[in-house]
Amino acid sequence: VGSEMCIRDRDGRNYIVYGNDEIWITELNEDLTAPKKDGLHRLLVSDHKNPELGYEGSHIQKINGYYYIFLVHSLRDRWMRTEACFYSDSLEGEFTGGDVLCDDRGYCGQGVAQGGIVDTPDGKWYAMLFQDSGAVGRIPILLPVTWKDHFPVFGQNGHVPEEIEVHSTRPGYIYQPLVGSDDFCNGLLPRWQFNHDPDPRYYHLDASQGTYTITTREVCTELTQAVNTLTQRMSYPSCAAEVTVDASALKEGDVAGLCALQSCYAAVGITKHHGKYEVLMLDKKEDGILDMTERTVVESHQMDFRLEADFCNMKDEARCYYRVNKGDWLPIGTVHKLYFKLDHFTGCRFGLFCYAAEETGGSACFRDFKYYDVDEIS
């Protein structure tokens, strides 16, 4: 258990560093498929019987003749993720060191930790770590690193600074945002990711019409089984999304709409029930129970859906809305509690979905996806 990292030394020998509580190093064979016979195998450091979290998340780097191992663990007296570093001038020698950063940035006791360090062309060093932030997931944290007696010093006065200045190697270059709106007129933008392996036979992107269409491939028992669900990561501290759905080609029992995707998901959608269209909220509880709340018959097969999420200080709540014919937004269902759990082990995401509950071959057409960050939510 725990993550691992490989390193190839300058003499061509290969090693893997791994473990949880106890961190081990094992020499590998030339093709990295097995331990090397009679190769190096030893315990490097131990945080044995830590009641919260022992050392894990190994990153090993060789810098200026020294080997550095960066690890995460928790303080023993309470849950507080903490970054540790140990170093040695030999893989067979003693590794010394300890904690190098214990700071939650004033946020809910969630320590910044786990990662490694990188240098820039101008000789500056930075650590790339992350902070658990509740249902929105893990947020990357960049902080400066300096050196004292060959040992890294993280942050400023033991803390993550609120702001740092970095020099770009591509001045003037315009970076595309990681999330944002899409009219589907320019192909699938890099900001989108499929929930799991997509099946191109069952989705269609029509750039001329600005539509993304999902056709159901198989009968599903719930949303997380749906194929070709298209997702974007949600943003801290709050965000919202809207999309227009044409449900005219749904088959009986199909459900299509907009979701806050995780194992305990919330979704607002449209279904076909006894030949009539109904809007509904899907409410997947922490205990695994799925509720379909507040089903409302509507006359139109085209609907706008909106989902708002509030992650501030780990509030972790989602709210669903719908509207007909561009009228007022109407709330549907209850305020939904979101979670960051090990079963999905990822931050919450907006998702466009369509799945079949009774028979396959139905489809839903999505257009005009709009993404709002905290400054744009009214």
Per-segment meaning from a language model:
Residues 1, 27-53, 86-107, 150, ...:
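Blade-edge beta-strand/turn elements of extracellular beta-propeller
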